[in-house]
Each structure stands twice: as structure tokens, then as C-alpha cells.
Amino acid sequence: MVIGKGLISSVFSNYIDSEDILIFASGVSDSNETRISEFNRELELVRLSLSKYPTMLFVYFSTYSIDHICLNSRPYTKHKLNIENLIQENSSNYLICRLSNIVGAGGNSSN
């Protein structure tokens, strides 16, 4: 299963019908985001997905910024860490990928 409609989710289109793996690619993608409403939207969708599909491998795309001293105090980075903690507390079957610049130059307005 793939949740999301953007660039990352399109890469995993062959998992759309998977009953074992949930690719969560529907989250805050702009690292300059500060709106609480956007963070809450992702938080609630992660909660819903975890409760609705508890046995599936939950694949989440986080950010390398969590370990970067200059970036880990930003709202986006704190939000991603909060989501990671939520996943770890509510699933025993997950993969969290802390990726850097996934999209590349020109694919996201914050790059």
C-alpha cells in the first residue's frame, strides 16, 4: 500500500497493492514549513494509518536533519522526530528512513 500522491510515492507505485508493506509518503515535504496545521495533518494521518494497518511494515521517510546540530531545532525537524517517536511507540514493524535531499534541485521550493 502507498499513502501519498507526490514524487516519492510515485517511485513506490509497484507497492500500491501490497498487503504487507505500507509506504507512507504523504507528509510535510518542505523543510521550511512552520504551519502547525500541516504538521498536525501528517500526525493524524500517521496515527490513523498505524491503527488501521497494525501488521503491515510501516515505511516512513524522515530527515537527516534530526542528527544535524544546526538544523535539529527547526519546527520541521522537531515534527519529524515526533512522528518517528509515534511510530516507534505504536508499531513493532517499521522502517524509518532518515534521508537527506530526496527531491534534488528544483523539485521542492525549499531547495
Please identify what each model-predicted range represents.
Residues 1-18:
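Canonical Rossmann dinucleotide-binding motif of NAD(H)/NADP(H)-dependent dehydrogenases/reductases
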Residues 14-55, 63-71:
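NAD(P)H-binding glycine-rich loop region in Rossmannoid oxidoreductase-like domains
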Residues 56-57, 93:
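Proline-centered loop/turn at the N-terminus of a beta-strand
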Residues 60-70, 75, 102-106:
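Conserved catalytic-site region of short-chain dehydrogenase/reductase
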Residues 62, 86-106:
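Conserved beta-loop-beta element that borders a ligand/cofactor-binding pocket
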Residues 79:
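Active-site helix of classical SDR
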Residues 83:
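Short active-site alpha-helical segment characteristic of glycosyltransferases
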Residues 107-111:
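Substrate-positioning beta->alpha
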